[in-house]
């Protein structure tokens, strides 16, 4: 969203400008993917062991992340062209930024109120996260397809709403982002490669 705003004010239009923007997004997403992979390498290793039947907690976390990823994986390819056609403008992005700020403020206020009134519900761990909670977070992540809506904000708020504490909501959000950003970057490379290759070479 922020990059689209900059491109609008910089008067970057046309196929070449869009290709350069896609190329730049791939580069910065690669940095985010590497950073999250490094920070959460222990959790990633735990999930790998879990899928080999050697770590039940890692297996549970891995399956929950896959479940949370499914809504975006199912909807993203079908909505990609529509989003680029209708939502990559200043007004839609401004609306998303404003609405996202209000949603985040509401969620934080709600969490503080619940923690104050019901200390026992102060926050669950990832071991307590159910598959229904995971898919709920995944559906909230889909709102981040709207440019200007923060993916991490939507998924952290989703974690709040299913009862996770702040640290675990953020952890789940970043691990989900590792999968989602990797898939999104791969999808863009496949579908936009002919336009982006010259800009990536530069």
Go through each PLM region and give its residues.
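Multi-pass membrane proteins that catalyze or facilitate reactions on polyprenyl-/lipid-phosphate substrates
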Residues: 1-202
């Amino acid at each position: 969203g922020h990059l689209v705003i900059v491109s609008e004010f910089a008067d970057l239009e046309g196929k070449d400008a869009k290709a350069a923007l896609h190329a730049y997004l791939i580069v910065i997403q690669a940095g985010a993917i590497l950073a999250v992979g490094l920070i959460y390498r222990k959790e990633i290793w735990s999930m790998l062991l879990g899928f080999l039947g050697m770590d039940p907690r890692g297996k549970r976390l891995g399956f929950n992340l896959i479940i949370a990823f499914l809504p975006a994986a199912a909807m993203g390819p079908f909505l990609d062209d529509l989003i680029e056609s209708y939502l990559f403008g200043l007004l839609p992005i401004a609306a998303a930024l404003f609405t996202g700020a209000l949603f985040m403020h509401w969620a934080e206020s709600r969490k503080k109120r619940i923690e104050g009134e019901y200390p026992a519900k102060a926050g669950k761990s990832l071991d307590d996260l159910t598959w229904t909670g995971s898919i709920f977070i995944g559906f909230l992540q889909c709102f981040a397809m709207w440019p200007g809506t923060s993916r991490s904000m939507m998924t952290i708020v989703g974690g709040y709403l299913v009862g996770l504490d702040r640290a675990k909501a953020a952890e789940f959000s970043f691990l989900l982002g590792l999968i989602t950003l990797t898939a999104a970057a791969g999808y863009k490379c496949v579908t936009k490669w002919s336009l982006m290759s010259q800009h990536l070479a530069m």
